[in-house]
């Protein structure tokens, strides 16, 4: 039976997350979710089970015109870097989930790095 795109995505997400957890135990996780219309990112403490900071194109006060493009992803990356600094976080590991490290996901990670977050 052929695997569907969704099944392949879920397998890839589990594989990536399990590899990252083995190497980065105890560190904070910068988790990305990308949909067809929006992109969001969370800074998660897996030990405590708490989200320390989050940013998304769904936030009205950030004033996104185009919500699902590289410019919006760059802005979300810089916003999460600012919020991480405000929470006292300087270092995290990047969890791309099942998404390829290309385009919007890469732009978000680069903007977070430029904002001072060590990924």
Curated annotation (Swiss-Prot):
Gene3D superfamilies the UniProt entry points to: 3.30.420.100
Query: Which cellular component terms (GO) are annotated to the entry?
Result: cytosolic large ribosomal subunit
Keywords, sorted A to Z: Ribonucleoprotein, Ribosomal protein, RNA-binding, rRNA-binding
**Organism domain of life:** Bacteria
Under the heading Pfam families, the entry gives: Ribosomal_L18p
Q: Name one GO biological process term.
A: translation
Has UniProt tagged this entry with the keyword rRNA-binding?
yes
Subunit and partners: Part of the 50S ribosomal subunit; part of the 5S rRNA/L5/L18/L25 subcomplex. Contacts the 5S and 23S rRNAs.
> What family is reported?
Belongs to the universal ribosomal protein uL18 family.
Q: What name has this protein been given in UniProt?
A: Large ribosomal subunit protein uL18
**What is the source species?**
Ruegeria sp. (strain TM1040) (Silicibacter sp.)
